[in-house]
Amino acid sequence: MKRYPQDPAPPKASGYFRERITPPRMLMTKPAPAKASSASTEDLQRICSQVRRDIIRMTHGAASGHPGGSLGCTEYLVALYFKVMAHDPSAWDMDGRDQDLFFLSNGHISPVWYSVLARSGYFPVKELATFRKLDSRLQGHPTTHEGLPGVRMASGSLGQGLSVGIGAALAKRLNGDDRLVYTLHGDGELQEGQVWEAAMSAAGHRVDNLIATVDWNGRQIDGDVDDVMPLGDLPAKWKAFGWDVLVEDHGNDMDRVLAALAEAKSRTGKGRPVVILLRTEMGQGVDYMMGTHKWHGVAPNDEQAARALEQLEETLGDY
């Protein structure tokens, strides 16, 4: 993990279908404070393998979806939900009072998020089999009107997640809630102007309980990001907008991801929002999907899915 050179030294860290949907539980009393998990790196790596199997099986079963970015972000989301974030699936409600919140801005990578939500206890794992099916709560882009626990915003219309995250972080500040807000964005998504309006706003309002992460895989649906719309010096850009910038070049190494998230947490509360620029590999874990943008939004066929599943250990049991 690299600290952007101009940064000061960091401080020391001291039912499946619509008829089965029920409204989110509204808590009438303050829940017990949520706590982060004590899962080991080995535990998290085993979960990653199963989540990647889920991604392949979901997109193959639906014959559509976005496997590439989902596979690349697996370590980040597994680390967040199974180790870092303070959250309690049994106390789910839309407010998330006294819990850390997460917003997925690049909603097309819903397969990895749905798998992580299910495997961490937000809804039954077997519901993953309904991905993109008619009347399923697990549509290609997450929505709130389906009533899926864990989902607090409809996403996939790119560029909006940072704005929502800022609003949630400011609400926590106003409510005296010291929990954090996390957001995830694609690097291609940074071509949306709303991202930079939000980035300027977050710094201007000193939203220092917010940790944004950019999935910096260098690829998007039409090709390499640098060929479609170059981002230039991305760390310098975020720095210029007033953010505390961390660069992690090994976004598919669980230990490095955990270290980056821990460092980011240690920098919160210091007057600036924090961004992690996380270098990942699209299609990580499946040999023929890596190193190309072509699996951004293409589902594997029967033969391709079988080949992928041979490379991914079943560790928690397939749905």
Per-segment meaning from a language model:
Residues 4-7, 16:
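Intrinsic-disorder-associated, low-complexity terminal segments enriched in Asp/Asn/His/Tyr and depleted
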Residues 27-51:
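N-terminal hydrophobic or amphipathic helices/low-complexity stretches enriched
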Residues 30, 254, 258-319:
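Glycine/aspartate-rich loop-and-adjacent alpha/beta segment that forms the canonical ThDP
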Residues 48-64, 215-217:
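N-terminal capping segment at the start of a domain
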Residues 58, 71-204:
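Cofactor-binding active-site loop characterized by glycine-rich and histidine/acidic residues
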Residues 108-109, 217-218, 279-283:
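Glycine-rich beta-alpha junction loops
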Residues 120, 228, 290-294:
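Short secondary-structure boundary/capping segments
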Residues 148-150, 154-268:
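Thiamine diphosphate
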